[in-house]
Swiss-Prot record:
It is found in: Nucleus inner membrane. It comes from the Eukaryota. The chain crosses the membrane at residues 3-30, 57-78, 97-113, 133-161, 189-207, 214-231. It is a multi-pass membrane protein. This is Nurim homolog. PANTHER family: NURIM.
Length: 253
């Protein structure tokens, strides 16, 4: 009976893995699709000349802020010791990361589905449709940003990151996956659980239309990442050492 429950948990974890990829795909389209230019936009510096544009943005900005707060709260609260201890008491310690990934994906999916644009006010706008070099610059910049994020996720062990490996190891009665990693890497993972601050920040701010809602999204998520990702000197030294080791391995080949 216990084995059956673990198998069902593993299937749920695999389903969560697939759902997370689906939501991330929607996030990529949401953040990286070039936005069309509208003459109805009002430059943020001209608000005094057209205050009605600001008034029409109130509603979307309020709701979008609530969506972001909900996502950030979920992302932080489910990492707390209180919640982790709760899963442990319920016998769901192995599913902790799967539950975290699932709830994160649900919150993000809800945010993307209900996001309200506030495009009556813009900080800047660049018409990339009329210029092939600008369009390719936009696409390549975002492509590189996503490549860094996905590459970093693979390096950081994507199945473990999304919780599949923990459930599988529990089914096979192995130790926790993190137990097989070095103490330096475990310390790094406790401070930064997924990449990449620079890559995601570039994607958030490198938009051809910086509307008020996009500015809100980019600013709040960047500040949250900066506060939540608390790397220390040991983490930096560890990553530098790993880079030196990798360069040495490549030269030796």
């Amino acid at each position: 009976m216990a084995t059956f429950a673990k198998v069902m948990l593993l299937l749920s974890s695999v389903a969560t893995f697939g759902y997370t990829f689906f939501v991330v795909g929607k996030l990529m389209l949401f953040l990286s699709t070039p936005r069309s230019i509208s003459k109805a936009h009002t430059w943020i510096f001209n608000l005094l000349d057209n205050k009605s544009r600001l008034e029409t943005a109130y509603g979307p900005i309020v709701f979008d802020t609530l969506y972001l707060i909900g996502f950030i709260f979920q992302h932080s609260f489910l990492k707390s010791a209180l919640v982790k201890n709760l899963w442990r008491k319920l016998g769901l310690a192995a599913a902790e990361r799967t539950i975290y990934s699932l709830t994160s994906s649900i919150c993000l999916h809800y945010l993307l589905k209900n996001w309200l644009p506030a495009q009556s006010i813009v900080l800047w706008q660049v018409d990339v449709d009329e210029s092939a070099p600008l369009w390719w610059t936009f696409v390549v910049t975002h492509g590189l940003g996503w490549a860094v994020i996905f590459g970093g996720s693979l390096i950081m062990d994507l199945p473990e990151l999304l919780g599949v490996k923990q459930v599988y190891y529990d089914l096979k009665e192995y130790g926790e996956p993190v137990a097989y990693k070095s103490s330096e890497l475990r310390n790094l993972y406790s401070h930064v659980r997924h990449p990449s601050f620079v890559g995601l920040s570039v994607i958030l701010f490198a938009t051809n239309v910086m509307s008020l809602d996009r500015l809100l999204l980019a600013s709040l998520l960047t500040v949250y990442m900066y506060v939540a990702w608390s790397t220390d000197d040991k983490d930096v030294a560890y990553q530098k050492q790993q880079l030196r080791n990798k360069k040495h391995e490549l030269k030796a080949q």
